[in-house]
Amino acid sequence: MVIRSEHRSIDAVLHGMQYLVNEIRTRKSKVDARVFSAMLYYLDAFPERVHHPKEDRYLLAPLRRDPAAKALVAELEREHALGGQALRTLEQHFIRYQEGGDKEFAAFGDAVDEFARNYWEHMRKEEERAFPIAEKVFNAEDWSAIDHAFPGDADPLAADRNTEDMQKLFSRIANLAPAPIGVGPRVR
């Protein structure tokens, strides 16, 4: 399912953010703030504005036909609705870290950990609970709608990077992030 591929892209960004936070925690490394900015922008531009609305329409809406899935669908829709606020909170912690320096890092690092943990739990819920239900209850029309809706997305980290803006964002993340995340300068 193409949604899994998009989840892997989101997962890569979350792991990248945690890796950088852990480099700062354990090595007191200096990380170019632009890489965090690009990652936060990605999380807003793709998952929040493209991926989740399409999941709501093409995955969760058809799942409502199964009475046993209604509570799960409501829970996932609520998480999607709250996702933007969670991202805004993370962005605020990042801004405070940028403005306040090292004394604000612990709160930012904790916010990254919490955001990633909640996001991973959300994706796990979709993949382990919603997808199996979809495999049982979706008809050919439902699958066709998913196939047509998702490959056209502009996910810069997925195999099909089909818009110039998203290609630029992917390149920016890859060029700013140090190895093993990208090809940017080593953290100091």
Region spans (language model):
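Small-residue-biased structural context
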Residues: 1-188
